[in-house]
Amino acid sequence: MSATEGTFDFGTLLVGTVAVSLSVSMVLLILKRLLRGQNVVAADSHSPVSWTGTDVCVAFMIMIGMQLGGVILIRSFVGPSIETRPVDLAASICSTVCAVVCTIGFFLKRGATLSMLGLSLLHWRQDAWRAIAGLALVVAPLLTLAGVLDSFVPYHHPIIDFLKAHQDATVTAMIVLSAVVVVPIAEELLFRRILQGWLETREAQRSGWEGPLPMTSYSKGWGSIAVASLCFGLAHYGQGAAWIPLTLFGMVLGWSVSQTGRLFSAILLHGAFNCVSVVICLLQNNQAS
């Protein structure tokens, strides 16, 4: 074993030990809160959403249609001699941003408010700490689960494959921008607030709940979170078995949003988790080279 390999192994062991320690600490803190009858995440009351199931379907069509349309449009303007992956990535970033803006505009036109869409920074410090605590909780178990599943069903993602094949600063920056900023905003808005928010409102109406959300019982609200999280996980179907840990990740994100009605902590946590994944991929690339 070379000195470089030894250093990398020690660094990996150190990072893994810290991650596991943080995760265990967070689990113990959660158990302590539950035994005391306290909320795991302090609940902030918020109003049920005003949009319908049809509006949710329109949001999905906007997001999917504009992303596919953006890539197709860009490809129609570039020649066959140009490598398509960087062009596709740039087109995906631009079209996703446009889709988010159009989706927000659509819901504002339908009578929603930015606060109802979860786009509030009123308690940003509190939400930031929640994201940090969430990352400490999930990063070790989810990455461990992903690693175990990868040994049975190899993980595959075209962007990650492209990153492994190209040690280019521009491409890396584009991937970081997409994975850490753009995608978390789009997916949290779509799955955690538009879809899950509508499901929560429907669940509250069916159960006869007349007050603000969240519903106070721990047994209430989980159905909506589970459905939205499964949809989030299945949106990544085809990337090996990644949809399984991502569904569990969605449950954590969904619970946080259900308690506050705000997306900021979920966006930060989602982006931070993706950032950790990208950094691990880059470290593996450096080790391989």
Language-model regions: role of each:
Residues 222-289:
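Functionally important transmembrane alpha-helices
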Residues 27-28, 99-109, 182-202:
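Transmembrane alpha-helical segments in integral membrane proteins
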Residues 1-116, 125-126, 278-289:
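N-terminal, membrane-interfacial amphipathic/helix-forming hydrophobic leader that caps
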Residues 51-61, 133-145, 209-242:
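Hydrophobic alpha-helical transmembrane segments of integral membrane proteins
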Residues 95-99, 178, 245-253:
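Hydrophobic core segments of transmembrane alpha-helices in multi-pass, intramembrane catalytic enzymes
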Residues 72-94, 105-183, 201-215, 287-289:
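Juxtamembrane helix-loop-helix connectors linking adjacent transmembrane helices
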Residues 125, 186-227, 255-262:
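Membrane-interface helix/loop boundary segments of multi-pass membrane proteins
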Residues 57, 89-90, 128-133, 173-177, ...:
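Hydrophobic alpha-helical transmembrane segments
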